[in-house]
Swiss-Prot record:
The keyword Manganese does not apply. Belongs to the DEAD box helicase family. DDX19/DBP5 subfamily. It catalyses: ATP + H2O = ADP + phosphate + H(+). It is a peripheral membrane protein. Residues 181-350 form the Helicase ATP-binding domain. Its EC number is 3.6.4.13. This is ATP-dependent RNA helicase DBP5. A motif (DEAD box) lies at residues 297-300. One of its GO terms (cellular component) is nuclear pore cytoplasmic filaments. The Q motif is unique to and characteristic of the DEAD box family of RNA helicases and controls ATP binding and hydrolysis. It comes from Cryptococcus neoformans var. neoformans serotype D (strain B-3501A). Residues 361-531 form the Helicase C-terminal domain. GO terms for molecular function: ATP binding; ATP hydrolysis activity; inositol hexakisphosphate binding; RNA binding; RNA helicase activity. Associates with the nuclear pore complex.
Amino acid sequence: MSDAQAPPASTSWADMVDEDEKQKQEQNMSNQNDGWGETATETSAPAPPPASAPVSSSNNDGWGEPAPSAPADNGWADAGASNGGSGANNNDGWFDAPVPPSSQPPKKEASDIQLQDDTEGLITNTFQVEVKLADLQGDPNSPLYSVQSFKELNLHEDLMKGIIAAGFQKPSKIQEKALPLLLSNPPRNLIGQSQSGTGKTAAFTLNMLSRVDPTIPTPQAICIAPSRELARQIQEVVDQIGQFTQVGTFLAIPGSWSRNSRIDKQILIGTPGTLVDMLMRGSRILDPRMIRVLVLDEADELIAQQGLGEQTFRIKQLLPPNVQNVLFSATFNDDVQEFADRFAPEANKIFLRKEDITVDAIRQLYLECDSEDQKYEALSALYDCLVIGQSIVFCKRKVTADHIAERLISEGHAVASLHGDKLSQERDAILDGFRNGETKVLITTNVIARGIDIPAVNMVVNYDVPDLGPGGNGPDIETYIHRIGRTGRFGRKGCSVIFTHDYRSKSDVERIMNTLGKPMKKIDARSTTDIEQLEKALKLAMKGPA
């Protein structure tokens, strides 16, 4: 829809109370899925995954035993195996280091990990995944490049235990396509366009866990994240899925390691600067020749931060030339596309169709104010709603986040602020306190707008409308989608409120409604004399259907 098109009609908050009461009654009459998540029922007619016979290995405690029709055999001792893809048929000689057992993939089944999965929040379970193969003669619609269950992947039983323990029964849509490509042999690069909430973290996690040898105490896979918060969360996902394996993880972020200590874990997860520092120190810290997989998550966010893109390529240059490179990004403008093609050349590619990205699972409202001061007064009045579960309040500037937090605390409210200017240890403690429920309300900037998933969050407040920055025209709708995607996770109900206070912010909200094709309920802060009724409207919004 164009910007010139009239926005969807909004309703007053008073009307909203009556309407939501009706919706609540209607909801009680229906037991349907209503778009909140995929059912756990597995589909029939499994498609065979890419097959390359795994090479058996003696004395490898099961990690190298043959598994029929395995899509990956750890791929590193049998790099010349044929699997329909083009690529090097030799190991380029960098296996002068000890060669790990040849096969690590037996079975596995489950879906996403709880911390970064669920097809129920931002992304509905009806989106389509488009596959583009690096081998132009290959058929992307072939059953070889799709699975319907994790059992078809013949993953290691210890990985299967971890997935099942996490409570998942079937792959998400993107996992159905990504996992056969990631696990095939010889290993091929992969570029994926995927938002948080689609299962991509579990996908590249399973690939890393399948590629490393737990009997060799040195890093064999590296995952790069643009922030320490996301790196810590990815480590939690890897540890959860790999809990029954002997694979260890190491968090490579500032302050997490002694500069002269050798790393004896198989998977490194961290931020670019720290990873460069480790690799530059050479064999005293780790052996770069042993790295088999390099993963980059949230590439678009990383590119947006000055210097991180260059550091990422420095990491790539310090690794063997035939490392499997995997890149995921939520958006793919020209800069991201160019970066991705350089980072992962000759890659298989997976994309979500843009029109399939929806926000239907989240109840959206906007609160119309007259001034910045009235915005704060409205936020303070809403505090009782913010602590029904947990809430995140997004601001444009760090100073605004601190100012709001200080004022709310001075009024006796329990909140915390989080942004990039805080010390690393302080940021960790603040986010941990929010994760475990010690803090109910977090005032923050975009530092946790992407990828960070906390199940108890059921309200997001956009105190400031996200914009495109200097020289930009209009709202940053991608950031808005990522922000509100912090709520409504894992089948829970979610509510989003965005504040307006002047012509520009009101116009931006209209453009957001037009683009998303979804009306927002209007709350007029100027006429709010009965706070209880306003709270009732928001509470109903969080309980009722989106």
